[in-house]
C-alpha cells in the first residue's frame, strides 16, 4: 500500500498561517526548493483541498510553460521553481471540494468529501507516494482516520502568536524519522504516524 505524505510549512508554535492568513514569516532558498523537488519526485499523485489547489493552479502552470513568476513570487531560484512546475504539471491531482468548483489544470479528479474507504482504495493502487499539500479540513479528516502515513514539517524559526494551528485536536502518535536544518534557519522534521488518534492510543 502506498503512503499519503503531508508536507506543511509551519511556525514554532504550530501554525500554518498567521492572523488573517498572513504568511510573511515564510522563508525560502535553494535548499528548501531542492527539498520540495525531492518531495514530489517521490510521488505520482498530488492531494489538495480546494483553496490550496486553486493557489497551485494559478501559480505553477505558467512557470511550467516558460513564464516568469507572477505576483507574490516565492523566494526561491526561478529555475528550480520551473523544474518543480514541470514535474507536477502532468501528475494526477486529487482535489477535495464540496462545491466541485476548482480551477482548470491537467489530470484533475474532484472528490466532494473525504470517504475513508475511497482513500484506502486510492492508497492500494500501484504507484509512488501521494503527496499532500494544504487544507486544514482535509488534513484533519485524514488524520482522524489514521490515513496520513508521514508528516514532513518545515518548521520556521518564528512564532505566529495566534493564527491557524495545524491541528485542533490532540495527536501524539508521531515518531521522529529525521531532522535536517537548512541555512535559512528552517528545520525539516520528518515523522511517521502510528495508527489511531491519541484518544484511541490511550484507550488501549
Predicted regions and their residues:
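Enzymes that bind and transform nitrogen-containing heteroaromatic metabolites
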Residues: 1-204
Amino acid at each position: 500500500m502506498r503512503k499519503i505524505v503531508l508536507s506543511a510549512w509551519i511556525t514554532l508554535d504550530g501554525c500554518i498561517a498567521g492572523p488573517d492568513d498572513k504568511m510573511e514569516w515564510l522563508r525560502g532558498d535553494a535548499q528548501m526548493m531542492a527539498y520540495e523537488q525531492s518531495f514530489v519526485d517521490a510521488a505520482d499523485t498530488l492531494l489538495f483541498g480546494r483553496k490550496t489547489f486553486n493557489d497551485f493552479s494559478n501559480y505553477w502552470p505558467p512557470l511550467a510553460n516558460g513564464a516568469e513568476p507572477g505576483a507574490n513570487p516565492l523566494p526561491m531560484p526561478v529555475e528550480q521553481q520551473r523544474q518543480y512546475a514541470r514535474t507536477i504539471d502532468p501528475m494526477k491531482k486529487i482535489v477535495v471540494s464540496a462545491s466541485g468548483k476548482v480551477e482548470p489544470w491537467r489530470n484533475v479528479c474532484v472528490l466532494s468529501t473525504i470517504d475513508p474507504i475511497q482513500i484506502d482504495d486510492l492508497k492500494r493502487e500501484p504507484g509512488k507516494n501521494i503527496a499532500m499539500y494544504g487544507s486544514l479540513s482535509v488534513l484533519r479528516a485524514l488524520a482522524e482516520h489514521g490515513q496520513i502515513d508521514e508528516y514532513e514539517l518545515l518548521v520556521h524559526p518564528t512564532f505566529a502568536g495566534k493564527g491557524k494551528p495545524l491541528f485542533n485536536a490532540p495527536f501524539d502518535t508521531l515518531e521522529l524519522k529525521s531532522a535536517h536544518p537548512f541555512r535559512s534557519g528552517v528545520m525539516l522534521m520528518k515523522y511517521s504516524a502510528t495508527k489511531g488518534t491519541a484518544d484511541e492510543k490511550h484507550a488501549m
